[in-house]
Amino acid sequence: HENNDFLHLCGVSLTGVVRRPDLGPYELRLLRNAAIMGAYSMADELGLPRPKNVTTLKPEGTISKCYDTTEGAHKPLARHIFNNVTFVKHDPLVPVLREAGYKIMPHPNGTGDWVITLPVAWDDVDFEKVGDLEVNEETAIDQLERYKLLMDNYVEQNCSITVSYDPSEVDAIVEWLLQYWDHYVGVSFLLRADPLKTAADLGFPYLPQQPVSKAEYDAYVASLKPIDLERVQAQSEDAVDMGNECAGGACPIR
């Protein structure tokens, strides 16, 4: 709280970065300057101190799903993906999705929740063909270069990115960090998973994201029925319980 009173930091972020390879240093600086001037003008109008920093780049996992775009600065795992998403057991979407033909399985945590398979495709992102799949084989250095581009031209705080790498790339990563240390604040590193392996191959009941072939993706999408969103909204409203247990202003989790 004290830091916020002193710094007045903003968090104006970007998402879907890999879908816009046309955005170079000039365009990113225009975006940064627009965000800064907007924040400064609002601070001046409200009689508040101007923020120390305005722009950042967050993980953007949840909001990107709402926007139907790629997450922050990250490149997707593959062109065609089955996203296995957890829904709580009383979510009104569950029966609607079941009737529409979506694959639904009980969550292995045993709480009564559900795991529902949602198909996702990225037709405007470049991938490498490996067998029947089109997957992300981007090198660690390419990911770090994207981080540097954003840090140099848009970000004032830090760019959140998890760099997937192979052990054979460690020497190149160290060399890059030493060369560009002044451009670097901090990133996460994660050993690259083999996109060709399934949940069964890895000993898990399911994977949060499973790369699939175009044929498998198309077959699943073709099996799905349209969803009546008005019905979903009505069921969501009906699901609100305003009984005595809600009298204190907070309803219990169902």
Locate each region found by the language model.
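Residue microenvironments linked to proteolytic maturation
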Residues: 13
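Short acidic, low-complexity intrinsically disordered linear motifs used
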Residues: 238-254
